[in-house]
Regions:
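A positional/architectural concept
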Residues: 1-56
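Charge/polar-rich, low-complexity and marginally structured segments
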Residues: 53-169
Length: 169
């Protein structure tokens, strides 16, 4: 069970604060709900029934500092993701990674997209718009969580990761 005031990552929504746990009657039956407020959209409210295992399983604790350090190290050391040339197949694989919420796979996805972007720039080209959109969603998820763990802004995460990798040598 999660507690009021704690932060979680909720599915593909990203970092949310559990603002309260309260009883609501939406469908004729009163239930307890986690009331989540996304960090990047404080006007939005998400209701998650406390007894709905399929939904509460999408709520994950934020990384610890040790887990974050390991993620950065493991992500940098991981085999590069092979770029799929067929846009439909690539988009499907990228969406599966986003939906999984797997932090290491998200890290590798971002690494692959950033590398591809650099290759395209060198050729005087741009990434497909759908790849840019996937990159933005993945950054929102992963950078949002890292920013929450470190208490920094999401746009400072990339330089933090680079400094950690340089420090490792």
């Amino acid at each position: 069970m999660f507690s009021v005031g704690s932060y979680v990552v909720y599915g593909s929504q990203g970092v949310c604060c559990i603002s309260e746990i309260r009883r609501e009657d939406f469908s004729g039956t009163a239930k307890d709900y986690y009331i989540l407020t996304p960090s990047d959209d404080p006007k939005m409210v998400i209701y998650v029934p406390t007894d709905a295992a399929t939904l509460t399983s999408q709520m994950r604790q934020l990384l610890s500092l040790d887990e974050l350090t390991a993620l950065i190290h493991d992500g940098a050391a991981a085999e590069p993701m092979e770029w799929i040339n067929d846009p439909r197949s690539r988009n499907e694989q990228f969406r599966q990674i986003l939906q999984s919420g797997d932090r290491l796979r998200l890290f590798c996805l971002l690494r692959a997209i950033h590398e591809r972007r650099e290759q395209q720039i060198a050729l005087g080209k741009k990434l497909y718009a759908v790849d840019e959109a996937i990159c933005q969603r993945a950054e929102k998820l992963l950078h949002g969580e890292i920013a929450a763990v470190l208490n920094i802004k999401p746009d400072e995460v990339q330089s933090y990761i680079q400094s950690q990798l340089l420090a490792e040598g």
